[in-house]
Amino acid sequence: MRTSQYLFSTLKETPNDAQVVSHQLMLRAGMIRSMASGLYNWLPTGVKVLKKVENIIREEMNKGGAIEVLMPVVQSAELWQESGRWEQYGPELLRFSDRGNRDFVLGPTHEEVITDLVRREVSSYKQLPLNLYQIQTKFRDEVRPRFGVMRSREFVMKDAYSFHTTQESLQQTYEVMYQVYTNIFTRLGLDFRAVQADTGSIGGSASHEFQVLASSGEDDVVFSTESDFAANIELAEAIAVGERQAPGKAMELVDTPNAKTIAELVEQFNLPIEKTVKTLIVKGATEDAPLVALIIRGDHELNEIKAQKHPLVADPLEFADETEIKAKIGAGVGSLGPVNLNIPAIIDRSVALMSDFGAGANIDGKHYFNINWERDAAMPEAFDLRNVAEGDPSPDGKGTLQIKRGIEVGHIFQLGKKYSEAMNATVQGEDGKPLVMTMGCYGIGVTRVVAAAIEQHHDERGIIWPTDEIAPFTVAIVPMNMHKSESVRAFAEELYQTLKAQGVDVIFDDRKERPGVMFADMELIGVPHMVVIGEKNLDKGEIEYKNRRNGEKQMIAKDRLLAFLAENVKA
């Protein structure tokens, strides 16, 4: 491609509204332009990268035995009503009516559509297992689109769905897809972790996320220092260690009028934060217990996903408001604790091991110090309620936990019969009777992969694509003063035609621009291999080569240039 015939839309300045590196560089490199909040036009450079990522995904999915299909973006509301998600899905689901006043949605995912398709097309157990996938646009009406294409409203996704007669068959395909995803992200050159995860609104049983490690990530990824254990922080089990010590002091009621938070209590009374607890009041799941207290250590964070799995806690978890709390307990949120508490309580496992600790007295402006279980308050049920912390023991007993930020780029689920039962998706079994199909679901955020690759691989000059396979161009020809030097123009033209004929994705910068501008643009868009042709070097029989990844420069004999590029460039 010649730059003179290309839409080359680089920017010198970083737009003010771009918060993360990938958004900044995708705008500056001329990959995307915003049309509206969370909606982007993809320009030629961006499309080239996107299609290369799609092709890698497609190749690996095909190797794994999946078959490509294409389903409509617009979906019938009847299918969503049949599955039960019409009522369950929140405002992210864009709903509209056609001219016949029939309800439709703009698809955020395709479980309903694929289940409907397969129940129509597959009738016998002999046709299973079956794994179908598509690469297609999705729409989710995010309340706060941000970070460019990392969290946009419209995005490209690869979603696959498998259908089985048994759980064992699903498990086999799940393991194949786990390996396919590992192959995809390895081939993309990403530093990633496959982690155990919560199934969320998709539903199902087993689930793994594929997280690209990056400081700008929205998820906390937890992994062991000495084993393969890895999990999303939402799912990582917190292990309580040690034994509860015997009481050391008598319980004391203390005036704390200016201590509304744990931080204020610790500072004003010089208490170790790990010797305090905080009491959080949430809505209960039953009429008998409309409010429930969750008690965790002062230095720990509540894990809402874990908490809402307790049978006493409403799912989804909802915090009680101040009015409800005061009406029931008689004190505000800054003065709550386990002593004389008149609602059911659940304590974190670590709280069960505490002694001589401080907590609110359920009287405004007062706290109890030196509380001990059984002596001062009945021991409630202990449950895993908290997020793990850096340095906690690994749940598998090997090593301690590290926590890093991650960008979720892939997610695989064992759906089981959640959708097939709801939508009566059956085949004839071996015994001739109807058999409800068992399903799996496997997604990759294609547009997010592009952003994640940039988050991991960039420098002050621009993008550094982790592999030649996804760079918009693999080789840049930069002829200096070509329009004034016939020898430079002729050599550059010959090299361009030769590389094109060899199938190399090459960009020929034939603009009448200063060399510095040309270099900066090619580095900004991340072309991994740059060939710089200057008249003086050409007269000496040499060509300058620059490697974008390691920054190295070297002079190559011009008669060896093609052989050198063949050895170093992945076409």
Swiss-Prot record:
Predominant localisation class: cytoplasm
EC numbers on record: 6.1.1.15
Reaction(s) the record says it catalyses: tRNA(Pro) + L-proline + ATP = L-prolyl-tRNA(Pro) + AMP + diphosphate
Record comment regarding domains: Consists of three domains: the N-terminal catalytic domain, the editing domain and the C-terminal anticodon-binding domain.
Subunit structure: Homodimer.
Keyword NAD part of the UniProt annotation: no
Organism: Actinobacillus succinogenes (strain ATCC 55618 / DSM 22257 / CCUG 43843 / 130Z)
Gene name as annotated: proS
NCBIfam families named among the record's database cross-references: PRK09194.1, proS_fam_II
PANTHER family: MITOCHONDRIAL RIBOSOME PROTEIN L39/PROLYL-TRNA LIGASE FAMILY MEMBER, PROLINE--TRNA LIGASE
Top-level EC class as recorded in UniProt: ligase
Xref: PROSITE patterns: AA_TRNA_LIGASE_II
Family: Belongs to the class-II aminoacyl-tRNA synthetase family. ProS type 1 subfamily.
Gene3D superfamilies found in the cross-reference section: Anticodon-binding domain (3.40.50.800), Bira Bifunctional Protein, Domain 2 (3.30.930.10)
Protein name: Proline--tRNA ligase
GO biological process, one term: prolyl-tRNA aminoacylation
Subcellular location: Cytoplasm
Assigned GO CC terms: cytosol
